[in-house]
Design a protein with these regions (language model features):
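Long, aromatic- and glycine/proline-rich binding clefts that accommodate carbohydrate-like moieties
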Residues: 852-854, 903-965, 993-998
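Extracytoplasmic
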Residues: 24-543
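Conserved N-terminal structural module of periplasmic/extracytoplasmic solute-binding proteins
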Residues: 22-26, 342, 430-652, 974-998
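Extracytoplasmic/periplasmic solute-binding protein
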Residues: 686-695, 700, 724-785, 791-792, ...
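Extracytoplasmic "Venus flytrap"/periplasmic binding protein-like
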Residues: 611-679, 683, 707-715, 822-825, ...
Length: 998
């Protein structure tokens, strides 16, 4: 009886509480909503009688589906795909309209000047500055879509492409017209040579200055072929606004070319040409005439004994392309010579083993013309081995190409072809799903309550229709890729995974919060897949011009040849030191130079030193690529003369022990000092001596999503006070803010040491906040920190409150969260700019880089001081030739050398590897646009270096410990900082006793 009564009471309480909660939902007081970042549900708003503001991210307001779609889930209404949908029904008149370059009206006559004659052509417009605008008047007799072709001569000797914005009648026709490129053409300076170890040396790449023409196209490869621009009949203004580069323009042409012939029509039109018999000519692909990019230099392959030229141990530059030849618009040209006019087959020994399961597409032109439609998109399938690829029709019948007797120019260009359709579809799906994902986050937050029913399908009426559309569109693209011969088991599995997640979400909307992490991962994977799809890598060894009956050499090794090849490589590994890039000749004046880094970097330095430094001074370089600890090498007597990239604290640590040379006493030091920012020598200065010359510097910039900020009606913060104001605006929508926080955690002791040696500069914002208050890290005599002073405590409190009071994440994936919009603003090192430009094409034009927020001073000015980090070049004390070592360091840190190294590095690895030189003049010579340079230089002038003192390593360690005590254990920040400061000062005092001043 007691049990039954107890059960009845419990049941009564349960039903009563349920009814009570249904009638009066539970929520905190309204005045605490902003402080707690509380997002009320629609039920709470209805209960309180509150009508939300009309805000696209205020998902408490139920927006009609059609309005949501128009605002969020499609491309920008001014994107090219929308432009063509609007104007695609207009004809493409088969006519040509020429506009002389010199007829332009210019905004700045000092940088843009007409010329009556230039390099054999009249009426040329010279554009010698990185800004300004030129406008041409054109009369179009017939309305329609026209392709625009520009005839130009590049003037920029640094090899920068000409970037510009195009407007028609004062308006940008579509978004992509805001960033157009006219490319350089490049060539090898000379044939491949060899070093003293019989390894091939890569020839430097230089611009080939000549007249060339290019149609305006999509630099991101989202659209296949040239852009079409709509013109009404009548007079129009076409304007170019320069963003970067220098150029001479002779002519602008509006035209439409007739459609390409099919292969059958081509054969019929060339029936008079014979199929030339008994011809077999081999050409090495690495011996190219011209290339569109400096990245397309000769490379090497030792995976096959059939790759020529061949050597089992030494480096032979015997291929071209690979990962460097993958972006739309990149081309390689060769000169081929045949004995007579006629029809020939062409076969390439090629390999596409980079993008798993993906095809590579190329267009093949002869003497500047694509001879038939099928040659406009040749598809090379994925294969991890070398293959012989002969362009053929769907039935495997090889194509014949018409060549003239004598020299012909053969060109292969990367094209997107049918993949452009998939790229556009994926971009639209990403645009839609990212917006839906942000709306879901605004309701659920990043960590949804699994027991709560969010009713997302009711709060976001467009959500399930969007998911259904996206899943269907993804499966349609998968089917098309499979039909075209793509590998359905490879990269397309990413599309299937996302489609499956969307299907399950549609079938069970209440499961969406549980699938949120899966959805985020699948969307990020699809964005990455778009990058993979955009890349079309292809490596070439050689190609053959031959008659149809010729026997083609096999492309892959037989078993015994491959086995012997691997045996020879294995034996050679016992006798060849692959860490040595090059050795000096015996008896020659020489120094040993170490580089901590990759072989490709070391080879660039060695190549530059050989053709400039050694050529000018006669001093030879023994270049070694090392990963060992320098201190161990010093103790063992195997240290180099010069280490060119010492970590931030290493020079002073070695100077304390008398192991490195004081450079300030050497001749010419004052001149060298002028190459850098005034503060740049500070971390390498110890007791009046300077022990390194700066090589690199890295500092913070702020990145934000312009599209999201515009939708929210907020501006990027200029001060930290404004920064605090936008945090709750973003948090109310469950968006995040990213600040740098690199704690001293590393999987190995060696990596932990490297983190410590990198210094405090950009590991977090503490030094930045400290410097913005006008405070230094240490007392002027370097015997104690300033952490017991009010300004330091205030900086520490502000730093920790970002995480304790404002809830900022301490660990995050900035790249993916910035792409999805989950983290629309962040302070990060400026190299993220290059990463986002290259690796996030789907948000191109939707974000900007600006200086970091500053602290308002008593006089109303804003202090934007920022910490920094970097590397420096040192000379070891034991060097036998101090003069030669000093000459090398001066040469290495000079503007010309640093700029060339940066350019060579970018040629090798692409724009994402933009070099962070510390040399001011060299920085201005790197391929930044004028706007990018101005932004970075503005912040760079605020950079303040952190000095290195005995025991200084203890600062970073204890700051990390203090940070964790405050953020994780909720201790008082002032007490914690003062407590750990005593430990720091004790260690500094101990080290000063160990390394006393003279």
């Amino acid at each position: 009886v007691i049990k039954k009564c107890f059960a009845i009471i419990l049941a009564f309480c349960f039903f009563f509480s349920t009814a009570l909660s249904a009638s009066s939902p539970q929520f905190p007081p309204i005045e605490l909503w902003d402080q707690l970042n509380f997002v009320p549900t629609q039920e709470i708003l209805d209960y309180l009688g509150i009508v939300p503001e009309e805000d696209p991210y205020e998902v408490r307001l139920i927006v009609p589906t059609d309005q949501v779609n128009d605002s969020f889930v499609t491309f920008s209404p001014t994107a090219y795909i929308r432009y063509i949908q609007e104007h695609g029904h207009y004809p493409s008149p088969l006519r040509s309209i020429s506009i002389p370059g010199s007829t332009a009206q210019v905004s700045d006559s000092e940088v843009i000047q007409p010329s009556t004659q230039f390099e054999g052509r009249p009426n040329v417009l010279h554009w010698t500055g990185q800004d300004g605008e030129a406008t041409w008047i054109v009369n179009v007799p017939e309305a329609g879509l026209y392709t625009i072709e520009v005839f130009y001569w590049m003037l920029d000797e640094r090899g920068r492409d000409f970037e510009f914005e195009l407007t028609i009648n004062g308006e940008r026709p579509f978004d992509e017209a805001g960033h157009l490129l006219l490319r350089h053409r490049w060539r090898d300076t000379h044939a491949i040579t060899q070093d003293r170890r019989s390894n091939d040396l890569r020839p430097p790449q230089i611009p080939a200055f000549m007249w060339k023409s290019q149609t305006l196209n999509d630099t991101e490869g989202m659209t296949d072929g040239a852009f079409n621009f709509f013109f009404e009949a009548g007079q129009h203004e076409i304007s170019f606004r320069a963003l970067r580069g220098e150029i001479a323009i002779s002519e602008i042409v509006l035209f439409n070319a007739p459609p390409l012939l099919t292969y059958v029509e081509f054969r019929a039109a060339n029936a008079h040409l014979p199929v030339v018999p008994n011809i077999f000519i081999t050409y090495e692909a690495e011996e190219a005439l011209y290339k569109s990019d400096a990245m397309l230099f000769p490379t090497y392959d030792r995976s096959s004994a059939l790759t020529t030229p061949y050597h089992h141990a030494n480096i032979r530059l015997n291929t071209i392309g690979g990962p460097n030849w993958q972006f739309p618009g990149q081309y390689i040209q060769w000169v081929v010579t045949v004995p007579e006019d006629g029809l020939y087959q062409i076969t390439f020994r090629a390999r596409q083993n980079v993008a798993l399961g993906m095809q590579s597409r190329r267009s093949l032109s002869v003497n500047g013309e694509i001879q038939f439609a099928e040659a406009a998109e040749l598809v090379i399938p994925y294969n991890h081995n070398w293959v012989n690829f002969t362009p053929s029709d769907a039935n495997g019948e090889p194509f014949l190409f018409a060549l003239n007797a004598g020299e012909n120019i053969l060109s292969l260009e990367v094209v997107m072809g049918s993949a452009a359709r998939t790229m556009s579809a994926i971009r639209e799906i990403l645009f839609m799903l990212n917006a839906d994902y942000r709306r879901i986050l605004a309701i659920t937050g990043p960590n949804p309550d699994m027991l709560q029913e969010y009713r997302l399908d009711q709060q976001i009426p467009s959500l399930l229709p969007n998911f259904e559309y996206a899943a269907a569109a993804l499966r349609a693209e998968i089917a098309l890729i499979e039909a075209e011969g793509g590998d359905s088991g490879g990269e397309t599995s990413i599309m299937e995974r996302l489609a499956t997640t969307l299907d399950m979400s549609v079938r069970d909307p209440d499961s969406i919060p549980r699938r949120l992490s899966d959805l985020e991962g699948a969307i990020s994977a699809l964005a990455t897949y778009m990058l993979v799809l955009r890349s079309q890598p292809l490596e070439l060894d050689k190609f053959y011009i031959h008659s149809p009956d010729a026997e083609i050499p096999r492309a892959t090794d037989g078993f015994w040849r491959a086995l012997w090849h691997q045996i020879r490589i294995f034996i050679a590994s016992f006798f060849i030191d692959f860490s040595v890039v090059d050795q000096a000749e015996e008896g020659a004046r020489a120094i040993t130079v170490w580089y901590f880094g990759g072989r490709d970097h070391a080879q660039i330095i060695h190549m530059m030193a050989t053709d400039t430094f050694t050529e000018q001074t006669g001093i030879q370089i023994s270049m070694q690529l090392v990963q060992t600890d320098l201190i161990t090498a010093i103790v063992s007597g195997n240290a180099p003369d010069v280490l060119i990239n010492a970590e931030r604290s290493m020079p002073v640590e070695l100077a304390m022990r008398g192991a490195v040379q004081d450079l300030s006493v050497l001749p010419g030091f004052d001149e060298v000092r002028e190459r850098f920012m005034p503060d740049a020598m500070l971390p390498y200065t110890f007791r009046g001596g300077v022990y390194a010359i700066p090589m690199t510097q890295m500092f913070h910039m702020m990145f934000y999503r312009t599209d999201i900020f515009t939708e929210l009606g907020i501006e990027p913060p200029d001060t930290w006070d404004e920064f605090y104001e936008i945090i709750p605006v973003l948090h109310r929508r469950n968006m995040q803010v990213g600040l740098p926080l690199d704690q001293m955690r590393a999987p190995t002791m060696g990596e932990a040491v490297m983190v410590a040696r990198a210094g405090l500069g950009i590991r977090n914002l503490f030094t930045t906040l400290l410097y913005q208050r006008g405070q230094d890290l240490f007392l002027p005599d370097g015997t104690m920190t300033t952490f017991d002073q009010d300004e330091s405590v205030e900086a520490f409190v502000q730093w920790t409150q970002f995480y304790t009071h404002h809830g900022l994440p301490d660990f995050f994936d900035f790249y993916n969260r910035f792409r999805t919009g989950m983290m629309p603003i962040g302070v990060q090192p400026w190299w993220w700019y290059n990463m986002l430009m290259v690796a996030a094409p789907e948000i191109r034009g939707m974000w900007e880089m600006v200086p970091i927020p500053g602290t308002v001073q008593p006089d109303g000015s804003i202090n934007r001081s920022s910490g920094t980090t970097g590397e420096g070049s040192i000379i070891l004390n034991h060097t036998d030739d101090l003069d030669a070592s000093w000459q090398f360091v001066k040469w290495w840190t000079s503007a010309e050398t640093q700029a060339r190294f940066g350019m060579e590095l970018e040629m090798l690895m692409g724009p994402a590897a933009r070099y962070n030189t510390a040399n001011l003049e060299a920085f201005s010579m790197l391929p930044w646009s004028l706007q990018e340079q101005e932004l970075l230089m503005y912040q760079w002038r605020w950079v303040r270096e952190v000095p290195v003192i005995p025991g200084g390593y203890y600062v970073a360690r204890n700051l990390d410990n203090a940070f964790r005590r405050v953020v994780i254990f909720d201790e008082n920040p002032r007490d914690v900082l003062l407590r750990f400061n005593r430990n720091i000062n004790a260690e500094i005092a101990r080290r000063l006793l160990e390394f006393p001043a003279d």
